[in-house]
UniProtKB/Swiss-Prot annotation:
UniProt keyword annotations, A-Z: Aromatic hydrocarbons catabolism, Dioxygenase, Iron, Oxidoreductase
Keyword Cell cycle found: no
Protein source organism: Cupriavidus pinatubonensis (strain JMP 134 / LMG 1197) (Cupriavidus necator (strain JMP 134))
Function: Catalyzes the non-heme iron(II)-dependent oxidative cleavage of 2,3-dihydroxyphenylpropionic acid and 2,3-dihydroxicinnamic acid into 2-hydroxy-6-ketononadienedioate and 2-hydroxy-6-ketononatrienedioate, respectively.
Assembly and binders: Homotetramer.
HAMAP family: MhpB (MF_01653)
GO MF entries: 3-carboxyethylcatechol 2,3-dioxygenase activity; ferrous iron binding
Gene symbol of the encoding locus: mhpB
Protein name per Swiss-Prot or TrEMBL: 2,3-dihydroxyphenylpropionate/2,3-dihydroxicinnamic acid 1,2-dioxygenase
InterPro entries the record matches: DHPP/DHXA_dioxygenase, Xdiol_dOase_suB
Amino acid sequence: MPIQLECLSHTPLHGYVDPAPEVVAEVERVQAAARDRVRAFDPELVVVFAPDHFNGFFYDVMPPFCIGAAATAIGDFKSLAGKLPVPADLALSLAESVMAADIDVALSHRMQVDHGCADALAALTGSLHRYPVIPVFINSVAPPMATLRRARLLGDAVGRFLSRAGKRVLVVGSGGISHEPPVPELAGASEEVAERLIAGRNPSPESRAARQARTVAAAKSFVAGDSHLHPLNPEWDRAFLSLLASGELTAVDGMTNDAITRDGGKSAHEIRTWVAAFGALAAYGPYRASLDFYRAIPEWIAGFATMHAEPAAV
């Protein structure tokens, strides 16, 4: 059965700290074109590879990968909130198949997803519940993290299952590219911050608002050039995007975690979601990919990109 891929960056800062109106309009135009492609494809299932930003996954138990058999979007920043229409039996079968392929993936029957997943669904489908969806969490901010090779192999295992599922499937990668927003780290954290990173589920509205305000303030400082955050790296971004487009996906295996942090920033590890999505597509055979948009957007603290792809035989 057919498969289609859409990969896109996300930002919680849209509407809080925005670039010039013409840049926002171009991003919205590109996302509208992606929605049109998805609408025409009319998927019977959407699989979203997405990170989390210490909103649903914490250091009490931090898996490298997790498949959601039931999931709720928490609605952080201005993202959509509510229950995702997850086909639980299919998600369970997916988890069993992935584990049979020697990829140790966790399973959640109460997954919480944040803007990293919800914004992608909103951008591509207009809602959380237009199509059945299986969220696949990939740890991208909380060391230790799996390698890009493992993310690729996760995607391959997911893709092999999907190719036998008898459904039109949209695979989505949400995250990246180069960026380093102010995500706290466990190493060297105060007792209060450490507790939030270990067991910070369901914070009070005041606590969530304070955290979001810190992110907005960091973006304003980043734009003003008064920030210690890692600079955006368009050259690195474009090299990564070109690698995906080339079809030589195994080349990502040589990208180490230390090199990703050094060149792209601490949150550039979200490229794992793109690698996994392309890994799923590649399980169907050779593909052709198009880069629809790329721009370094300081206001959103992100190298911002959109790609789509499909099997070469289509």
